[in-house]
Amino acid sequence: MKLFGSSGIRGIANKEITPELALNVGLVLGSRKKTAVIGRDPRVSAPMIEHALIAGMTATGCAVTEIGLVSTPTLAYAAREYECGVMVTASHNPSEYVGIKLWNPDGMAFDSAQQEEIEKAIEDADFSLVPWNLIGKFEEDGNAIRAHMNMIKKLVGSSSLKVVLDCGCGAGGTITPYLLQELGCEVITLNAQPDGHFPARNPEPNDENLTMLKKAVVDFGADLGIAHDGDADRMMAVDEKGNFVSGDEMLAIFGLYECSGKKGTVVVPVDTSMMVGDSLQGSEIVRTRVGDVYVAEGIKQSGAIYGGEPSGSWIFPKISYCPDGIYAAAKLVEIVKEKKLSELREELPRYATKRGALPCANDKKAEFMEKVKAKLEPLGKVLDIDGIRVEMDNGWVLVRPSGTEAKVRITAEARENVDEIFDMAEKIAKEALK
């Protein structure tokens, strides 16, 4: 039984993710943990799933503390005082989705071995209900947001910048506006009222969805704009000119400051731009599979000082292995206090990137990738942890099967003549599909 993807258990509410499934997850988890903390994002279906999880955990003897509507990084930080954390969220997915993400006390999401243990136990009904007098204690705690804010305030300096903050009607509205105000910022909020229908925009904080934020930054003469997804584990930005800052640019900017004055290891996924490595001269770049869980595992294994992925997940292991969009927002404000965001962007190297996709049936992907690997291997240094990435003198190309669609994706980046690299890879891919 496969339940977990790269972002925990996730699917459409009452179709793929049901109260029965949540109850079973709770029963299995409660049989293995003595204490747990649980929270939720503002999705309409989140309380339903949360209550089922609580019922399962307490029925098997686990003491559960409920912290209410919170961001995922707030929940992951709270988990440090429990044996595990449980977050009901579907992150950046649309409103009909819901999910369950499980956290270790160090802020690391459950790894593959832990996930497989849960899946097998559900399949085998490997749990036991406790007698009435051993049912787990249930309590509520309203202090998690304040504790998270206090931790960040100890690590980040104050600032008087004017910031436009688009919370996307997500859980970030419970913490980021208040944190930035307490740090001294003038904060103008957009979509700060949590609403599980996400009426203002799609929860994913990408360039296409942040039209309102880009305009507001210019109209209000703000120093920068900040945006979250539904559970605020992600954070993206807009510079003072109203231009969206790409994920690769954000990776490089944070990396420059985290690595300032010292050499260190930075962990990024395989689809990350050369911009990051070229900006962080002297630092070791470690590449992982795409997904913040894999980046976090890479950080822990390598002892890296920072990592993230261009979708908006920034991980600072000195505070947690969970991507923390709240801390990242405060940190970016501290950085921009010293230099404008547009100027920071201008200092980064720029390379041409080209992306495309080809249809490929899911049951043909493995055979396709073997053929592509054989053709690409002689062309450069190969990394095959997630698709096939080939690094050449002039750039790199990545051929990677989609995890959600019947497609294969091709990404090429080059210092010059990107079309040449892309066309070469596309030709090889098309031949492999025959």
UniProtKB/Swiss-Prot annotation:
Q: GO terms for biological process?
A: carbohydrate metabolic process
User: Which SUPFAM superfamilies does this UniProt record tie to the protein?
Assistant: Phosphoglucomutase, C-terminal domain (SSF55957), Phosphoglucomutase, first 3 domains (SSF53738)
Q: Tell me the residues on which Phosphoserine occurs.
A: S91
Task: State the Gene3D superfamilies in the record.
Answer: Alpha-D-Glucose-1,6-Bisphosphate, subunit A, domain 3 (3.40.120.10), Alpha-D-phosphohexomutase, C-terminal domain (3.30.310.50)
Q: Which residues bind Mg(2+)?
A: S91, D229, D231, D233
Any idea of its EC number?
5.4.2.10
- CDD domains linked to this entry: PGM_like1
| Molecular function as annotated in GO | magnesium ion binding; phosphoglucosamine mutase activity
Cofactor entry: Mg(2+)
EC class:
isomerase
Gene field: glmM
What's this protein's name? Probable phosphoglucosamine mutase
PROSITE patterns referenced in this protein's UniProt entry, alphabetically = PGM_PMM (PS00710)
Into which family does the record put it? Belongs to the phosphohexose mutase family.
Q: Which superkingdom does the taxonomy of this entry point to?
A: Archaea
Q: Which organism is it from?
A: Methanosarcina barkeri (strain Fusaro / DSM 804)
Q: What does this protein do?
A: Catalyzes the conversion of glucosamine-6-phosphate to glucosamine-1-phosphate.
Q: Give the UniProt keywords, A-Z.
A: Isomerase, Magnesium, Metal-binding, Phosphoprotein
| Cofactor binding: number and manner | Binds 1 Mg(2+) ion per subunit.
Q: Which reaction does it catalyse?
A: alpha-D-glucosamine 1-phosphate = D-glucosamine 6-phosphate
PANTHER family in alphabetical order: PHOSPHOMANNOMUTASE
Q: How is it modified after translation?
A: Activated by phosphorylation.
Residues of the active site: S91 (phosphoserine intermediate)
